[in-house]
Amino acid sequence: VKVNKIQTEENKDKTLRQDAESCILADCSLCPRNCHVDRTAGKTGYCGMNQKVKIARAALHMWEEPCISGTRGSGAVFFTGCNLRCCFCQNREIAIGDSGLEITEERLAEIFLELQEKDAANINLVTGTHYIPQIIAALDCAKKHGLNIPVVYNCGGYENTETLKLLDGYVDIYLPDYKYAESELAVKFSHANDYPERAMEAVNEMVRQTGMPQFDAEGYMKRGTIVRHLILPGHTRNSKKVLKLLHKTFGKQIYISIMNQYTPVFEQKEYTELNRCVTRREYEKVLDYAFELGIENGFFQDGETARAVSYTHLRAHE
């Protein structure tokens, strides 16, 4: 009788959860695109995804910042689809929805637990904005079955603050991009003219939730916000503006990860300045500016491509 009662309660919870999820996805405004399409009816908005969860990869990932991957690896789940259309995207097939496998929320919960069993330092949700209701459901299920490692929300920064509030209490670490301080570049390269404003609002909400960065004895982040910025060739001015804005607004409340891993994966016909890597001079110019600002909490990269990089704490560069 006790087992039946538990099962009945779980079924009730699942029904209520599914009703709430359907209500959100039936008029989708999870991200700033505010498409208002009915994804429960199989329709898709800007992200290209309907209600069914689709993932491209789930595995231990060793290429994040040291406090995220460490030596154990981050339990990364790469979700298919994206609310940005960056012309330089290195994961284009995943972003436009051509790659991946449809799974249930229950299977997603199992994947979280399997990654924990592999000794993942955390669960790393990569580009999951358009699946937040389903992710929350999967996390609820996984936590009931023993999930207890930190959860990382890894995103492009183009977020709706009201949607982020749904993640309060579920996400321990936020890992957003802050790509552009200049809206002109946001329009050109990612088709999102309001990116600077939305990304700043998003980081504010993330910091509100996580508070000051916290680390365990092994150096893994337990709680906090790391903001990433990828330097683009020919656009160091934008990078300087980003660093100044982030440091002035948040100071030591966040870590800033300055990345030089931009790699042209296909030839740009319209934006030819993107057909090369960032030069050493460009990268050092941005790093020097970071030190001029007094940024200490952060990381920079050694290496010149997305695959050949390692992270170093900013203080080690002095």
Predicted regions: what is each one?
Residues V1-S74, L84:
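Flexible, acidic/Gly-rich N-terminal and inter-domain linker regions that tether
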Residues V171-E182, Y255-Q261:
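Non-cysteine beta-strand/loop elements that form the S-adenosyl-L-methionine
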Residues T312-E318:
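Conserved small/polar residues in nucleotide/adenosyl-binding loops
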Residues S190-A192, V203-N238, V242, N260-Q261, ...:
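Conserved strand-turn element in the central/C-terminal portion of the radical SAM core barrel
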Residues G128-H130, G156-Y158, L230-L232, M259-T263, ...:
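Active-site beta-loop-alpha junctions enriched in small/polar residues
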Residues C47-I173, E182-S183:
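Conserved Radical SAM active-site core
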Residues E93-S99, K188-N193, E270-C277:
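Short glycine-enriched, charge-decorated loop/helix-capping segments at active-site entrances
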Residues F112, I136-L139, L164, V203, ...:
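Generic structural signal for well-ordered alpha-helices
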